[in-house]
Amino acid sequence: MDQLFTRVARDRLTCLMLGAAEVAAALVRKRNGGVISPADFSAAMRDLRAEVLDAADFAKPPSDDVLINASVPLLEKHSINATDAVVLLAALRLAAQLRAAGRDLVLVACDRRLLRAAQAEGLLTFDPENQTQAELDALLSP
C-alpha cells in the first residue's frame, strides 16, 4: 500500500470506514496466524490509524443503512459478502460521479471475489498483494 500512498495525492483517496475496519481485521488475522510479527502488526496498525482512520485529509464516507440496503442486489449477483457488497456499491457510486467529471476510480483490494465483482461491474482494480508498481502506474496515468 505504500506505493499507492506515495503515488496518489491524499485528496484523491477514499475509504469507507467499514473498509478500513476490514483492513484492521485482516492485519489481526495475519498476526494471529503468525504471518506477521507482533511488532510488524503494531506498526501496521499505527500506520493505518495515522494514514487513514484518524487522517483529516483522507475521505471516509459513511456506510449507512440506505447504502447497506441498496447493496443487497450486488451480494446476490456476485456471491460476495455483505461488507464487499457495501464497498462495491460505494465504489460504483463514486466512480459514476468521477466519470461524469472526466476522471475515474481504481478500487484497491486484496479480496479476489471483490476484485472480480468490481471488474464485472466495469471498475478498474488494483491488488497490492499481486500487482506491481508498474501496473499501478499504468492505472493511474492520465
Task: Specify the residue positions occupied by each region the protein language model found.
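Hydrophobic core segments within long, regular secondary-structure runs in both alpha-
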Residues: 2, 41-49, 68, 72, ...
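Short, well-structured N-terminal submotif of metal-dependent ribonuclease cores
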Residues: 1-19, 27-44, 129-142
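Conserved phosphoryl-transfer catalytic core
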Residues: 23
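Active-site neighborhoods of divalent-metal-dependent phosphate/nucleic-acid chemistry enzymes
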Residues: 54-113
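Hydrophobic/aromatic ligand-binding patch that stacks against planar heteroaromatic rings
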Residues: 4, 90, 117
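Residue-level signal for well-ordered alpha-helical positions
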Residues: 26, 74, 120-121
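Helix-adjacent hinge/juxtasegments
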Residues: 29-65
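Acidic, PIN/NYN-like endoribonuclease modules and their adjacent C-terminal/linker elements
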Residues: 94-142
